[in-house]
Amino acid sequence: MHKSEDQLLCALGRLAELLQRIGHPRALEVADHLVGFRQAPGQMLRRLNGNDWWAGAGSLAAETMADNPGLPEALWCREIREFRELMIEIGEALQAEGAANPGISSWLLAFNNWNASEV
């Protein structure tokens, strides 16, 4: 397994935990991807590079802009920041593996800018 795949597995695990903590509807899907990655890494890399992760309003990346579901504001801000940081880690690992989804670069730029601005 490549270093980027190890990083990807670690980030996926942490993302699954975070999504579970905040009650996100895609938490189980991300956890399933983690299990699937161990069984069929090539297939999971293709899925993680897919539009449902990186393109448009329904993508997981876009979920980082979701409204607070009722958590204390300071907690929500920390969780969303971590969500973006994990998506950055996943996006960078995918790029290191040769991922070509055009949405990844745009989201990485946005996430880094938002985190730097403390948005």
Regions found by a protein language model. Give the residues of each.
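Residue-level recognition of alpha-helical structural elements
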Residues: 1-4, 8, 26, 44-46, ...
